[in-house]
Amino acid sequence: VLLLAIVSLVKSDQICIGYHANNSTEQVDTIMEKNVTVTHAQDILEKTHNGKLCDLDGVKPLILRDCSVAGWLLGNPMCDEFINVPEWSYIVERASPANDLCYPGDFNDYEELKHLLSRINHFEKIQIFPKSSWPNHEASSGVSSACPYQGRSSFFRNVVWLIKKNSAYPTIKRSYNNTNQEDLLVLWGIHHPNDAAEQTKLYQNPTTYISVGTSTLNQRLVPKIATRSKVNGQSGRMEFFWTILKPNDAINFESNGNFIAPEYAYKIVKKGDSAIMKSELEYGNCNTKCQTPMGAINSSMPFHNIHPLTIGECPKYVKSNRLVLATGLRNSPQREIRRKKRGLFGAIAGFIEGGWQGMVDGWYGYHHSNEQGSGYAADKESTQKAIDGVTNKVNSIIDKMNTQFEAVGREFNNLERRIENLNKKMEDGFLDVWTYNAELLVLMENERTLDFHDSNVKNLYDKVRLQLRDNAKELGNGCFEFYHKCDNECMESVKNGTYDYPHYSEEARLNREEISGVKLESIGTYQILSIYSTVASSLALAIMV
């Protein structure tokens, strides 16, 4: 009787609820655990670049090569290739360009000018004071061996070094009205001689000044005559200045010596997002949507760890080395125990103890076994809802991190080192916060994703349990054992939620009562084991005899 009962139980029809498993070794971290193996994961941290300078959305960068921004704007003779430049997407300057201020000196508010350039995409150079407009001064003699061109002394192309003429330097009074609709970048300078002899040799007047005025600027400069060490063979120095002249405003110059006059000015014809990048890279004849000083990034990932300074549509920079988002389930593949004919599997195939590698068309589903055979079937509805939810997860993370901290790579002069240090600390602090937020968000979302999948499996289990009620027995491993015959049509009704409980309840009741009559517990577990042991021993003894 006991043997018949056991055989009867083994041959009962079953349906199990389970989840997908595969050979994935992808691992994620959660708030509670590290290195959780999952069926599917998505790396959301871009770590690669192409190592090249590329066009940005089809617009070429302005790569200054051996020229600095100052050398380009003033017109260092060695930077003639940049006399007229087309629209640029961003500007690239080397860390220590060779062709800077060929005549030694300073560029006043240079760092602020560079910051201004990070919002400009195109200049149009226009002539405001032609060399021929200085009849009472030498406009071509102001050259220096410090600025050579083709083996001869030369000077910056966009400004004019005015020298005395016929032993006289008449006072200059010149104005320029900006009749353009665009802002105008105007450059000028002052020469600081080495000694009084050089002062009178060049400008005749021993005491000189330069006055510059606009509606917003009131400047008066005087030369600083001093003995200095030679740089580029020069003991003198030059100091350059700039201003933005608004439309309908005028700039007025007055000077009786030492004046470096503007010949050309820059009309700002296009403003937009740009940047000045410090990079030694070469142009790669490529196109990108995101550029860094290390190279271009072509990625749809929400984060990157390549360089904090970027230009274009870029992922958000974080200091993390790893950000992996769980999109699938916990991956714990379980071997199935199959019978030769019907493929019936045992308790270890349940969702509590392991996932199914045989179910490949969904995340959650069923495995059934009856007289007609056995097989897997994904639950398409719950799987699709889960896919939709997880698909939106990356977008959700992007939305939650949609404010990019702007690391513009600002520069500071020597007098602003404390400000620079403070600025760097603030930038580092912001980046630390962004990194912490990104890492914490990923940990939390991974926890939620895995809990979400667990909940979906439980919901599917409860859906079956509530339909079958006492027409089947819960085996405790995600499987139900029917107390009645359940053919393929019956199995399908359980899966789609249309199972007819009353139709099968009488057959189930009779089988349930029959099984109850031979319950193992009526004999006792230890007695059953004892009987089995005795029978096995007797059989072994008989074989030996």
Swiss-Prot record:
Question: Which key words tag this protein in UniProt?
Answer: Clathrin- and caveolin-independent endocytosis of virus by host, Clathrin-mediated endocytosis of virus by host, Disulfide bond, Fusion of virus membrane with host endosomal membrane, Fusion of virus membrane with host membrane, Glycoprotein, Hemagglutinin, Host cell membrane, Host membrane, Host-virus interaction, Lipoprotein, Membrane, Palmitate, Signal, Transmembrane, Transmembrane helix, Viral attachment to host cell, Viral envelope protein, Viral penetration into host cytoplasm, Virion, Virus endocytosis by host, Virus entry into host cell
| Biological process per Gene Ontology, one example term | clathrin-dependent endocytosis of virus by host cell
PTM summary: Palmitoylated. In natural infection, inactive HA is matured into HA1 and HA2 outside the cell by one or more trypsin-like, arginine-specific endoprotease secreted by the bronchial epithelial cells. One identified protease that may be involved in this process is secreted in lungs by club cells.
Signal peptide residues on this chain, from the entry's feature table: 1-12
In this chain's numbering, which residues are marked as the site (Cleavage)? R342, G343
UniProt GO cellular component terms: host cell plasma membrane; membrane; viral envelope; virion membrane
Q: What is its main location?
A: virion
Write out the GO MF terms.
host cell surface receptor binding
Q: Which residues are glycosylated?
A: N22, N23, N35, N177, N298, N496
The intrachain disulfides are C16-C479, C54-C286, C67-C79, C102-C147, C290-C314, C486-C490
Its placement in the membrane is given as: Single-pass type I membrane protein
Where found in the cell?
Answer: Virion membrane; Host apical cell membrane
- Annotated SUPFAM superfamilies: Influenza hemagglutinin (stalk) (SSF58064), Viral protein domain (SSF49818)
User: Please, which domain of life does this record's source organism belong to?
Assistant: Viruses
* Functional description taken from the UniProt entry: Binds to sialic acid-containing receptors on the cell surface, bringing about the attachment of the virus particle to the cell. This attachment induces virion internalization either through clathrin-dependent endocytosis or through clathrin- and caveolin-independent pathway. Plays a major role in the determination of host range restriction and virulence. Class I viral fusion protein. Responsible for penetration of the virus into the cell cytoplasm by mediating the fusion of the membrane of the endocytosed virus particle with the endosomal membrane.
Q: What else is known?
A: Major glycoprotein, comprises over 80% of the envelope proteins present in virus particle. The extent of infection into host organism is determined by HA. Influenza viruses bud from the apical surface of polarized epithelial cells (e.g. bronchial epithelial cells) into lumen of lungs and are therefore usually pneumotropic. The reason is that HA is cleaved by tryptase clara which is restricted to lungs. However, HAs of H5 and H7 pantropic avian viruses subtypes can be cleaved by furin and subtilisin-type enzymes, allowing the virus to grow in other organs than lungs.
Q: Family per UniProt?
A: Belongs to the influenza viruses hemagglutinin family.
Record text on subunit structure and interactions: Homotrimer of disulfide-linked HA1-HA2.
The protein's name is Hemagglutinin
Q: Which organism is it from?
A: Influenza A virus (strain A/Teal/China/2978.1/2002 H5N1 genotype W)
Q: Which gene encodes it?
A: HA
